[in-house]
Amino acid sequence: MKRLFFMISAVLTTAFASAQTLTLEQCRQAAVENNKQVEQSRVEQEKSGHAVRLYKTNFLPKFNIVAADLYSFGKSDVKIPGGHLPIYSYNDAAGQFVPNVTMNADGTYTLNQYADFPSQKMKLKMDNIFLGGVMFEQPIYMGGKVTAAYNMSKIGEKIAGLNIKKTESEVIVATDEAYTMVVRAKEMVKVAEAYKAMLDELYKNVESAFRHGMRTRNDVLKVQVKQNEVELSIQKANNAVRLAKMNLCYYIGKPLEADIDVDASELNDESHEGVVADPLLILNRPEYEMLNQKMELAHEQVKLTRSDYLPNVALTGGYTYINGMKLDGKRLIDNGAASAMVTFKFPVFHFGEGSHKVRMAKAEQRLASLERDDLNNKMTLELTQAANNLNEAIAEVKMTAKSLEQAEENVRMSRKQFDVGYETLTEHLEAQSLWQKAYADDVEARCNLFLMKSRYLKAAGQLLF
């Protein structure tokens, strides 16, 4: 029998030894690295970074290569009428060439000498026409639109970064809760097993006394009923441990059936001091800064909306080459040229469209301000409640520790009095039950204190990864 016991003990020892023991910090880090919401927030930040670089390019000129090729079967005849061309001779007095004509009395001229110019008829064919070149566009003044859009993209990037911190703090709190569930469940197993050991020892004494005629069968049954209850408690506690570990595995990105354990010493910090809910602490929260950035975003949106109804000035230009068209079989166009153009647009009258759009943007800005004030009040309330809960949890730990100490002393005194017959079995069982409850309350209070501290740090903006 002893050999079988040692074999079972060895197997259990090996099993527990193979479990990976995780610290609270390791669980937090794994949860942040594997959480999908954190990953989404990081992708959003990456996207916002690309948006900043995208809108920055609007300050720079844009170059494009343009090309087009047209082939047309269209053609037409070009007729140039004939006539007389005057002949010029050099006039020494005038120092220039003058036409050889005679002025009539009615003011008309008669050509003294002329050359005949016969009429011309030529074929113009569209044939193949090619156009190609390099064009550029450079905004000079867009009413502040380019600057406003760029500023909005930078604000969006800041908000994305703050959202990562916010999501990480939420994940840390959720991980702390899952971690604490494992510690609580493990400690409850210890409570139940310690209570069982106490009952087992009592049962041996009562059963021995019954065999010697010093106790009744009813006394034995009373102890057995308590033993059955504690067996069920142990089973429930072990089930709670398994479920709590699976829940923790879910948060830290491990398979649900992974063999893990936690370091319970993280929750045994004896240095507990009360806190004061200073409203200025909410300034540390990423949510607070996000609200301020949203206000700035709404302010820039007003500028962006107004820019649609302000003057726009832009510079365009480039170099274009054209080759095409034939006149009597010879290429008519075959050259290139540089060009530049300044465009100016000034909205004049849109039936109040711009005014209404700007007012809508300003209304959104006021809504953002109201939202900020409302959420600031909510964060202050959350901080106050978290501080109260933490202070109450500190007081509760002190009380349960004292109650446990008193319950331990009470069960010792009860055992002595029971052994000498000054106390009934029912009274002694009640003392043991009070000790078990005090032990469980102390475990619950310590776990609750750890959670209240974690939630307070989040509410105060101090729980950052």
Predicted regions and their residues:
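Hydrophobic h-region of N-terminal signal peptides that target proteins for export
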Residues: 9-18
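Bacterial Sec-pathway N-terminal export signals of envelope proteins
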Residues: 19-77, 256-299, 348, 464-465
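Amphipathic alpha-helical coiled-coil scaffold segments and their short linker/junction regions
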Residues: 28-34, 84-119, 254-317
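Small/polar (Gly/Ser/Thr/Ala-rich) solvent-exposed segments
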Residues: 39, 62-77, 120-127, 137-166, ...
